[in-house]
């Protein structure tokens, strides 16, 4: 069986997943832009270009009249590769809607169509009121879900999704919230396949064994850890505010922030103004997996105060309890409130501080939560189960 995937680029976590799919007997062809497509790959996201078991085909791109990227060579590649399945994600499934020739090519060649998305910021069909409780912000925390033009685009996108999903043979989704959302677009639940998103957990757990046997890197403390690019929508400022509320009660605690980004100076200034110099440690970016593993192993709690990614999975590989808010939906399949972490009220520093303090006061609970985190990775959401 041959499958063509369309992506904006090959991320460091996607590559081992695709290799694993190939090992299971699937011929995989990745179609990616010949230049980085910033519309589909966020700033600072690490891309790879190394040897792999799957094939890579490059396509020229252009911006469609509707403002999103088009893979101009996609039809040619499909004609040449003759796949059994084509997998289209955002924004490339818009190309399926607007390009009648692409639709005919897929139909005439009996190519099965699969749509792939989280879904994130996708309301149930017809429910524009969704955006009142789930406002859309960009990376700089500027509100996007306002004004007539936004809601007209959102309504049009709903109908486009409904059309595309009607013609899809199946969907691949990263989060189980797909079971609640996609049926409103006419998708039968038996066509929805949740595969979750994961880093290379096999590699991480092997590395963990080496980290466990290595001498400590850091002074022993109750360490609260955050890893991620320092941009506004990660809400590291909220985490610092929350820590300021509890740190006087925990003199042996430390907030460690790993990552670089445009908000670094602002966050350092915030910590200094709150009297947290020496208590909030900005490490900068760490690219060495072993060193990163040491930081996770020698921490007590992992906190994601805003939008996140696979850092939750990675922290769970190191038996960490996780505190987060509801973000893109993927966290709901990883973190069970009161079992291996806590959810706090989004944007509420008091709520976040309360969750952190509760775990700091209960080290046995931290240990139990961390054990559940690791078990969930080992048994449920790992490289093998999602591929």
Where is each model-derived feature located?
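Short acidic/histidine- and often glycine-rich active-site loop of Leloir-type glycosyltransferases
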Residues: 313-317, 327-338, 342-343
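Donor nucleotide-sugar binding/catalytic pocket of nucleotide-sugar-dependent glycosyltransferases
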Residues: 150-213, 314
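Nucleotide-activated donor-binding/catalytic signature segment of Leloir-type glycosyltransferases, i.e.
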Residues: 265-286
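Conserved donor-binding/catalytic core segment of Leloir-type glycosyltransferases
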Residues: 4, 216-234, 238-243, 256
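Conserved acidic donor-binding segment of nucleotide-sugar-dependent glycosyltransferases
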Residues: 285, 337-338, 342-349, 358-364
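Acidic donor-binding loop of glycosyltransferase active sites
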Residues: 294-307, 320-321
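A short, well-ordered alpha-helix in the C-terminal region of glycosyltransferases
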Residues: 252, 279, 351, 358, ...
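Short alpha-helical donor nucleotide-sugar binding micro-motif in glycosyltransferases
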Residues: 285, 292-299, 315-316
